[in-house]
Amino acid sequence: MMMHQLRSRPTRFVALVALAAGALFLAAGGSEGACPPAGARYVVSGGSALVAVDPPPGQPKNDKGGSAMFGGTVARNMVNLTDKNIPGKFEPEDKEVLLWKADLGSKAYGGPTVAGGRIYVGTNNQRPRNDRDIHRTKDGMVEPLDKGVLMCFDEKTGKFLWQAVHDKLESGRVNDWPEEGVCATPTVEGDRVYYVSNRCTVMCLDANGFADGNQGFQGEKYKEKTDADVVWQYDMMKELNVFPHNMSAGCPLIVGDILFVHTANGVDDGHLNLPSPNAPSFIALDKKTGKLLWKNSLPGKNIMHGQWSNPTYAEIDGVKQVIFPGGDGWVYSFVPETGELIWKFDGNPKDSVYELGGTGTRSDYIGTPVIYDNKIYIGLGQDPEHSTGISHFFCIAPKKDKKGDISGVLEVKTKGADGKDVIGEKPNPNSCVVWHFGGEEARKFALRDFKFGRTMSTACIVDDILYISELAGQIHCMNAKTGEHYWKYDTKASIWGSAYFVDGKVYLATDSGDLFVFKHEKTPAKIDELEGITATELKEARKQIKARQKEVADKYLIAKIELDAPIRSTAHVTNGVLYVMTEKTLYAFKGKK
């Protein structure tokens, strides 16, 4: 396959060691019959009832008081329909626009989450807030100790309030990569802050810190006024034998009294062995106590690499369900109270193959499922170290009368002339696929041989218009109902975050430190860079393609704003303020009066 090279900075949160040559094919099930609750382990306690938290059938609603989780709501749609007068074209240091900025560590991926007058972000300790977290060398030099850190700031002023500081795992980079810090975006409900630490521990903190005394757990390592007050913690490595690959990065989902999270179970440093194939990938905890309610060991031995996606909740066609993307390329739906499997969906072609280093055609998920109009939207991707490659984006609509495998196709095996198995496909009568975008691009003069590349991003859907970005730098604008493709734009830098809609604009940040702002239209123009090309030679064709690309930029690009460092998070707006988190700085921007 022709590989489209990423134009990005070299650092990565899941940096890989040298890989052995060869390929590893991991196939997941694909029978036509209904699936039993494979891998389910029921540890259900009484009194843990779900309350109705149903996303609306169309437009999502946002909490004016503050977005409390990744994606804003349980639907995980990156859309804000409330705030207005959000700056779209500005200079970062313009005092009329810059409300405040706060120093972080040297890496920051988790957040920001804004709730209750506070802002929470995950980072590292490369710019320490406490002298105890440094090392003084014999010659008097000061070096920061490597730690994972969750920081809390005041929403209005950016004043530092407190932080949770986590030691690194003793096992090292295979489970806890150096200097990556806390990668999870926190979830906040009331005065409780939930996240997964770099130590693969689910944390519940008191949002007030120690200002209201020591709540819950009493054994905190640090208890100064700027330290975090731990209410409870659940160590997934100790309790469940989970083996996180390089980093734990789950953003918890809360529905009623239940907290859902990925465990990050994955392969070892050799990338061929799965140390804990029977450990759960998906769990549910009591949000008040941290008690395990249920666990599920899917995908089990079929995990290809790591697992860094997030769960989503929805009631679709009358069925309440929690939806987990798996590290085998399948999406799984479970009964929220028990963990019983409802359905599963394979996003890869049946003849796809996972290969070490990302040269294969089979992928898993880093982006989070989005619920819109009773449908699920998700794209496939891989560790960013694997670069880009052929991928797929799906819209699926599960039905209450369809259980088990709802993939678009089923696997068919035949014998080739050499006697070896040949993998093929046939239509799945139980399919719930509405539309699919991606696969091979065979049109003449195409700049690459696939339509859609691997993505780490979560979709943004508003007015039936969908925005989804790729790791390689492209953002696509499509019809959410039909999958019709309107236009795409190449930012020329890798994208780790997601598109975010607010105030008629779409914000998208890149690894080069740029914040792109696009104009949203309810009826976008269809500008296909390859359609209608009249050239017969490549040189002339490229000129025509560039003209189409310029047409997209002229019509939709509002601004390209340069910030101080790579941005590997999603822009966010709460209470009229635009928050942008680079690797080392949290910015708060306001609209001009």
Language-model features, listed with the residues they occupy:
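Bacterial N-terminal signal peptides
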Residues: 14-27
